[in-house]
Curated annotation (Swiss-Prot):
One of the record's GO cellular component terms: periplasmic space
Family: Belongs to the TolB family.
Top-rank taxon: Bacteria
SUPFAM superfamilies reported for this sequence: TolB, N-terminal domain (SSF52964), Tricorn protease N-terminal domain (SSF69304)
Cited function: Part of the Tol-Pal system, which plays a role in outer membrane invagination during cell division and is important for maintaining outer membrane integrity.
One Pfam short name: TolB_N
Coiled-coil regions, chain positions: none
Name the record gives this protein: Tol-Pal system protein TolB
Signal peptide segment: 1-28
GO biological process assignments: cell division; protein import
Subcellular location: Periplasm
InterPro entries attached to this UniProt entry: 6-blade_b-propeller_TolB-like, PD40, Tol-Pal_TolB, TolB_N
Assembly and interaction partners: The Tol-Pal system is composed of five core proteins: the inner membrane proteins TolA, TolQ and TolR, the periplasmic protein TolB and the outer membrane protein Pal. They form a network linking the inner and outer membranes and the peptidoglycan layer.
Length: 434
């Protein structure tokens, strides 16, 4: 009787959480607004590329926006430039040095007879008066945005030592109450452009997550007469497969680093527990066995451990599980509520939602040093997801009662808003490198 009541309560809570998040309609591209950058952001100049005005996409403008959005760089407005060199021969270093600019990017876009473009760029160090790198791309016109993001990735890595994540995607769920199928699963470029709708449904969609190669996604859908099921969707072929539809809860899927397994939450035996599903053999392995609610599993990079949320100590806390011997130990001790964890690619930082003074914030725990820092100042944060380079965290929150996405650097020094043009967005998931 106790288990039955617990299962019913959990299901009611799950559905209530989803439906209460949707207040107004959502659709279209995400907007990008840097609300707080580093005080020591690096001054950089992206000179408008020669030939960009007549192109379908202005590659130089996209590169400038990417670098600005990272919060690590402070681009010089083009109107403030004393000169606009197109190449190394035209570079006048003193024109940028006097303005305090440390790096300069020049480039050109030349239309080819095939209809595509030759896009070249170069990066210069003003202090050393030296060219650091240069590259040339020959994309079709339809891939100019991809080239721009690739250039941003290369420059970001050259100057920070960290791979750029501008060519990645953001997966999220929206809701439009005026649509016959109001729930939508969508993804967009990391800068909010080129939105693609994967699924439309008249029932809630939850917990989207990427496969390690970025070719598939898994998610929870209530489309089967309101019952939750876990689906895998191939982005290239649009084929879908239902991989979990047991009685009770089917939730919180997460791909193993090798892409061979899904960790998930099931209540098929009466209590919400963590399971592992072999995607090839469909063999299901139970990993936890506790009277508390165990949910929200996330794989660690080594593929041998998971972190998950459990109520076994009273309130929700984060625990670490060894999948081989099934040993469990608690890893979060700050306050009475810690949930919805994610892990940086190097396994060093644990990111999760922490409750403090009635507010729900994103916190970052250093697993090596044991330190913990709250990195957001909003009060209804949920679903943090770490970028594949470990530098940023995207999460859902609320502004004026409406759901938006925001991103924050792992040290809390850079903050970016990604509100929808028309309404609510929830459940973000940052893609792997693509």
């Amino acid at each position: 009787m106790q288990q039955t009541c617990k299962r019913k309560i959990w299901m009611q809570i799950s559905v209530a959480l989803v439906t209460s998040l949707w207040m107004i309609s959502a659709q279209a591209e995400l907007l990008i607004k840097v609300t707080e950058g580093r005080v020591d952001a690096v001054p950089i100049a992206v000179v408008p590329f020669d030939g960009a005005k007549n192109a379908e996409e202005d590659v130089s403008a996209i590169v400038q926006a990417d670098l600005h959005r990272s919060g690590q760089f402070k681009p010089l407005p083009p109107q403030d430039m004393l000169s606009r060199p197109r190449n190394e021969q035209e570079m006048i270093y003193r024109d940028f040095k006097v303005l305090g600019t440390e790096y300069v990017i020049t480039g050109s876009m030349k239309r080819q007879e095939t209809g595509g473009y030759e896009v070249g760029y170069a990066l210069f160090d003003v202090a050393r008066q030296k060219k650091l790198m240069s590259e040339t791309y020959r994309p079709p016109a339809s891939q100019l945005r991809d080239v721009a993001h690739a250039i941003s990735d290369r420059i970001y890595e050259q100057l920070t030592g960290i791979p750029g994540a501008f060519s990645t995607k953001i997966l999220y769920v929206t809701h439009n109450r005026h649509d016959a199928n109001p729930y939508q699963l969508q993804y967009a470029d990391a800068d909010g452009h080129r939105v693609t709708t994967i699924l439309r449904s008249n029932e809630p969609i939850m917990s989207p997550t990427w496969s390690p190669d970025g070719r598939k996604i898994a998610y929870v859908s209530f489309e089967d007469q309101g019952r939750p099921g876990i689906y895998i969707h191939n982005l290239a072929t649009t084929e879908r497969e239902k991989v979990s539809s047991f009685s009770g809860i089917n939730g919180a899927p997460d791909w193993s680093p090798d892409g061979q397994h899904l960790a998930l939450t099931l209540s098929r035996d009466g209590n919400p527990e963590i399971y592992m599903l072999n995607l090839s053999t469909k063999v299901l392995t139970r990993l936890t066995n506790n009277y508390g609610i165990d949910t929200e599993p996330r794989w660690l990079p080594d593929g041998e451990h998971l972190v998950f949320t459990s109520s076994r100590s009273g309130g929700p806390q984060i625990y670490k599980l060894n999948i081989n011997d099934k040993s469990v130990r608690r890893v979060s001790f700050q306050g009475g509520y810690n949930a919805r964890s994610d892990v940086t690619p190097d396994g060093r930082y644990l990111v999760y939602v922490h409750r403090r003074n009635g507010n729900y914030n994103v916190g970052v725990q250093d697993l090596q040093r044991g330190t913990f820092n709250i990195v957001t100042r909003t009060d209804m944060d949920e679903s943090p997801s770490v970028a594949p380079n470990g530098s940023m965290v995207i999460y859902g929150t609320q502004h004026g009662g409406a759901g938006v996405l925001e991103a924050v650097s792992i040290d809390g020094r850079v903050k970016v808003e990604l509100p929808s043009k028309e309404g609510e967005v929830r459940e973000p998931a940052w893609s792997p490198f693509l």
